[in-house]
């Protein structure tokens, strides 16, 4: 037993040293320095060293002794400071070991790879862990200053025994992975300093009795407990864990598909073997115990590809097998079509592989030229990756059904994962599909041409985008890159996918819908308002309803009513100018509106509205996408491209939208029925702001308006005629007063409801017979509206006079018809000071009572 243990330790040390050497060989000098010094900087804590902060900061790595390069660094510090004090060695030091994991040291490591470092610490660290985390954060910043991307992960040595999981935002994948995270660590870990990993010493056949076997090794003195890092065994995985982990890999593959597709397929291979899955880490350990140092030194990336290849061959999926090989080749980043003198071992391995795959020189040249791929190749690659991921997703769903899963990932994590998949892949009208998730660094085009095809032609009407100058030969011989009915969508697609840049030459054939100057303005406005790179959506954002973050309202891009004013004399009064009901014809000067917005899930959406109701439809759409508890958009811009009155139209639209958004987001249960009237093309519309929705209703007359804002709408047969064609009760004629709105209620006999006579400010009359409902509620709602809505109307709307309406009841007293003020408790709480005209009318009504 002793000899066997010593042999295993020697193999472990040899494999670890091979991995360290390979890791350093693939690194640039700055990377090598950071990798070498990190253990020293975690072992010591000194003001002259990176990562220093005041306080009692845990430091010191168990069993650490510096190598030659590390000692040279320590000597240089001591020359400036004097002898460094060693960490307090009473008992165990706080850091059990420092390990790099992932692609580091494997064939998958490239010059641009980042470093994932596990800092495993004693369980008793507890409250001091936060200070160690701060030290690690300072070391990350120091490494970034050297051009090296390092991420530290603090790991309690008992974490996996207690089945603790981090949040979805971290690299440890939230609650969806536990054993699988440990599986990756065990197969890829490189010990930089500290204790050896105990799991490697336990034979695969003893995995089910891991703890008992470890105790027997300690009891027999074969191993000393304080010399080993024990994170626990790899227990059998549940189907739920495979499901959650696979969803997580799909989540990662959205932003970095080439990097994640291999891991995604490994998990699919695991689930295909379930319940008899043999983890890759266990296979590597079994070969280590047998002395079979295969797969180019048990390279974890090569072994991962081998396992995936076996699986895809078994299910006869040659399409995804070819894809995963290309992803592997691109991840290694060796460029075999070009001569190189460095990293010989990686180049030799990759050469053997591509020869076995039967790849041609042309394919190698194409893959090695990935940095210069343009939209055609990128779109093809995107579709291929998307198909592969969706196939993995379908297989995953079948796996879940086959095993009657109750998913172990928390509902919140699953919701976040599903939301991101939806946001990235669901194709919806108006949604801008982003086709370049780290596939190629530069999709910019030298020329972009936008061509409009009117209705009635062979091709469908709309806009076509070409990456050619507008010569007939070039256009005819090429397929369009993209088509859409509306120009805004094409510009957004080209901009957000990186084809349209500041150096792109723009061309347009717009059939008078849009010219080059307007197109250039649009591109400039969009690029200045929408940054291309934004932070990834947080798990909290993905778990919540999506909200508009950046909004652009694009006015009169394709249809500009003011273009008709050219060479005409247009008479208007600026003091009474209403761009939504302009001039004697009451014309709406907003002919088209395009919306362009990015939401909190980082989706980019476009919408188009045209015609006289474009403003109203756009308003309803914007407000409908804002739930009542949403945050205000971070930015809201109105871009107007009218030939005339551009500034005024832009200002009016901005004011209207801002007012409506404020009303929408401030509506509460305590104040239902918030309202705004908008006059468009001579017609007045009411926008009603409820907690759950925003509705619009055309208001052709006063009672339609009053009924609409009443919780208990009146029901009756409206009869609307001119004053000279109707006989009002004489008592109403006698009380009519210009300048205010007056309501007269007249009860019908035999419970047939009541009539309403309404006189507006000009004494125009509307009559409604046989109305039903509550007069009290009608009076209350109308009065509430008048007392609180002085600023709710757009410019030019004279639909309502803001003097408080007067309400009267027609009654029979002493055989005579009389008018008395309507007694309503609803009016008692309204603190409105009547105008002098109101006072005069009130006196008049009081006199009438006495007649």
From Swiss-Prot:
GO molecular function, one term: ATP binding
Gene that produces this protein: cya
Name this protein carries in UniProt: Adenylate cyclase
Region spans: Regulatory: 540-851
InterPro entries on file: Adenylate_cyclase_1, Adenylate_cyclase_1_CS, Adenylate_cyclase_1_N
Record field: catalytic activity: ATP = 3',5'-cyclic AMP + diphosphate
A Gene Ontology cellular-component term: cytoplasm
Keywords: ATP-binding, cAMP biosynthesis, Cytoplasm, Lyase, Nucleotide-binding
Top-level EC class as recorded in UniProt: lyase
Compartments reported by the entry: Cytoplasm
EC number: 4.6.1.1
């Amino acid at each position: 037993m002793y000899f066997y243990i010593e042999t295993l330790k020697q193999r472990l040390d040899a494999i670890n040293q091979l991995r360290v050497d390979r890791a350093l060989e693939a690194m640039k000098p700055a990377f090598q320095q950071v990798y070498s010094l990190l253990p020293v900087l975690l072992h010591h804590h000194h003001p002259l060293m990176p990562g220093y902060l005041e306080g009692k900061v845990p430091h010191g790595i168990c069993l650490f002794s510096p190598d030659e390069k590390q000692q040279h660094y320590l000597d240089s510090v001591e020359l400036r400071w004097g002898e460094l004090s060693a960490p307090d060695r009473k008992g165990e030091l706080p850091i059990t070991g420092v390990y790099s994991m992932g692609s580091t040291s494997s064939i998958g490591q490239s010059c641009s790879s980042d470093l994932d470092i596990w800092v495993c610490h004693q369980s008793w660290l507890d409250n001091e862990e936060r200070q160690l985390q701060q030290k690690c954060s300072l070391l990350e910043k120091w490494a970034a200053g050297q051009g090296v991307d390092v991420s530290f992960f603090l790991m309690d040595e008992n974490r996996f025994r207690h089945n603790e999981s981090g949040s979805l935002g971290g690299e440890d994948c939230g609650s969806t992975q536990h054993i699988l995270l440990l599986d990756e660590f065990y197969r890829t870990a490189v010990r930089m300093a500290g204790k050896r990993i105990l799991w490697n010493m336990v034979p695969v056949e003893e995995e089910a009795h891991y703890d008992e076997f470890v105790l027997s090794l300690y009891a027999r003195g074969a191993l000393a407990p304080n010399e080993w890092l024990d994170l626990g065994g790899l227990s059998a995985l549940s189907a739920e864990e495979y499901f959650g982990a696979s969803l997580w890999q799909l989540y990662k593959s959205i932003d970095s598909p080439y990097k994640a597709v291999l891991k995604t397929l490994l998990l699919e291979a695991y689930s295909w073997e379930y319940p008899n899955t043999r983890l890759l880490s266990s296979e590597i350990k079994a070969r280590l115990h047998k002395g079979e140092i295969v797969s180019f030194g048990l390279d974890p990336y090569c072994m991962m590809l081998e396992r995936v290849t076996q699986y895809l061959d078994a299910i006869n999926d040659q399409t995804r097998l070819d894809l995963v090989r290309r992803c592997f080749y691109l991840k290694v980043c060796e460029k075999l079509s070009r001569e190189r003198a460095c990293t010989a071992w990686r180049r030799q391995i990759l050469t053997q592989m591509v020869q076995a795959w039967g790849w041609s020189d042309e394919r190698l040249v194409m893959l090695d030229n990935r940095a210069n791929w343009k939209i055609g190749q990128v779109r093809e690659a995107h579709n291929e990756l998307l198909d592969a991921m969706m196939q993995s997703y379908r297989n995953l769903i079948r796996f879940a059904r086959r095993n009657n899963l109750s998913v172990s990932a928390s509902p919140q994590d699953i919701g976040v994962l599903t939301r991101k998949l939806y946001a990235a892949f669901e194709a919806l009208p108006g949604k801008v599909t982003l086709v370049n998730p780290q596939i190629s660094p530069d999709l910019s085009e030298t020329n972009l041409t936008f061509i409009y095809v009117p209705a009635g032609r062979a091709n469908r009407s709309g806009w076509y985008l070409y990456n050619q100058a507008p010569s007939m030969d070039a256009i005819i011989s090429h397929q369009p890159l993209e088509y859409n009915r509306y120009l805004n969508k094409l510009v957004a697609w080209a901009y957000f996918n990186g084809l349209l840049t500041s150096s792109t030459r723009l061309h347009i054939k717009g059939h008078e819908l849009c010219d080059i100057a307007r197109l250039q303005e649009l591109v400039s406005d969009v690029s200045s308002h929408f940054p291309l790179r934004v932070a990834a959506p947080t798990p909290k954002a993905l778990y919540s309803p999506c909200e508009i973050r950046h909004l652009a309202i694009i006015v009169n891009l394709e249809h500009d009513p003011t273009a008709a004013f050219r060479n005409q004399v247009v008479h208007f009064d600026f003091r009474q100018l209403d761009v939504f009901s302009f001039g004697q014809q009451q014309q709406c000067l907003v002919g088209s509106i395009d919306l362009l917005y990015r939401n909190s899930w980082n989706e980019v959406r476009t919408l188009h509205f045209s015609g006289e109701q474009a403003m109203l439809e756009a308003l309803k759409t914007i407000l409908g996408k804002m739930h009542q508890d949403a945050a205000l958009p971070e930015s809201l811009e109105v871009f107007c491209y009218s030939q005339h009155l551009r500034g005024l139209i832009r200002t009016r639209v901005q004011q209207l939208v801002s007012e409506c958004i404020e009303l929408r987001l401030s509506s509460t249960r305590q104040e239902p029925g918030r309202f705004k009237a908008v006059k468009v093309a001579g017609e007045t519309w009411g926008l009603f702001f409820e907690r759950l929705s925003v509705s619009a209703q055309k208001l052709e007359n006063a009672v339609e308006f009053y009924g609409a804002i009443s919780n208990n709408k009146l029901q009756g047969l409206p009869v609307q005629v001119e004053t000279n064609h109707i006989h009002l009760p004489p008592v109403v004629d006698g009380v009519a007063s210009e300048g205010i709105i007056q309501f007269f209620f007249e009860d019908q006999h035999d419970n047939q409801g009541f009539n309403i006579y309404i006189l507006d400010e000009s004494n125009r009359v509307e009559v409604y017979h046989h109305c039903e409902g509550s007069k009290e509620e009608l009076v209350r709602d109308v009065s509430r509206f008048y007392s609180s809505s002085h600023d709710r109307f757009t410019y030019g709307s004279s639909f309502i006079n803001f003097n408080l309406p007067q309400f009267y009841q027609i009654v029979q007293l002493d055989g005579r018809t009389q008018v008395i003020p309507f007694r309503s408790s609803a009016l008692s709480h309204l603190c409105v000071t009547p105008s002098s005209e109101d006072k005069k009318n009130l006196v008049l009504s009081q006199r009438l009572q006495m007649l």
